[in-house]
Design a protein with these regions (language model features):
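Non-catalytic alpha/beta scaffold blocks inside enzyme catalytic domains
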Residues: 2-159
Length: 159
């Protein structure tokens, strides 16, 4: 799961799929070699604005796929596709052009935090709102809308 997802997106995912998926929180961004780890003002070692909420909702278990895994959903950048189980269909939600986009069986181009609104809860527990700086490109959708649509499909498909 994306540690850049908003509180609202993470909660929507949990409500829709938390009981159906084994969920693993990933760091979408890592500190670059030579980059300052942290300071006493602005720089934090965790480069992911909502990892705290993601871990509260989904835990911090290391990535491990069960042998019976039959579907993988990857949300956001930073996933190592080489670690995904072979031969298992992959749904990928990503906001950026990346080689992995073409390896997914289903790809959804999603918005960045600059194109949507929501809330993050930081490392200290403070919740802050963010708002769009500009509109989404044609064909781009918010991850929350994807999760809501897939959840609706799941309800309709259940006898």
């Amino acid at each position: 799961l994306s540690s850049w997802g908003s509180n609202e997106e993470l909660q929507t995912f949990k409500s829709a799929f938390g009981q159906h998926f084994a969920c693993f929180v990933k760091a979408d961004h890592q500190r670059a070699d030579g980059e300052v780890d942290h300071d006493n003002l602005l720089i934090r070692s965790d480069k992911n604005p909502n990892r705290r909420t993601a871990r509260v909702l989904f835990g911090d278990a290391p990535l491990a796929f069960a042998p019976e895994t039959d579907l993988v959903l990857v949300w956001g950048e930073g996933a190592d596709f080489a670690r995904l189980p072979r031969g298992v269909p992959v749904i990928f939600l990503n906001a950026f052009l990346a080689p992995e986009n073409g390896h997914a069986d289903v790809f959804f181009p999603i918005s960045t935090m600059l194109e949507r609104h929501g809330h993050f809860t930081n490392f200290a527990g403070a919740t802050s709102a963010f708002a769009p700086c500009f509109g989404k490109a044609a064909g781009v959708v918010d991850a929350q809308a994807v999760f809501e649509a897939l959840a609706l499909t799941q309800v309709v498909a259940t006898p």
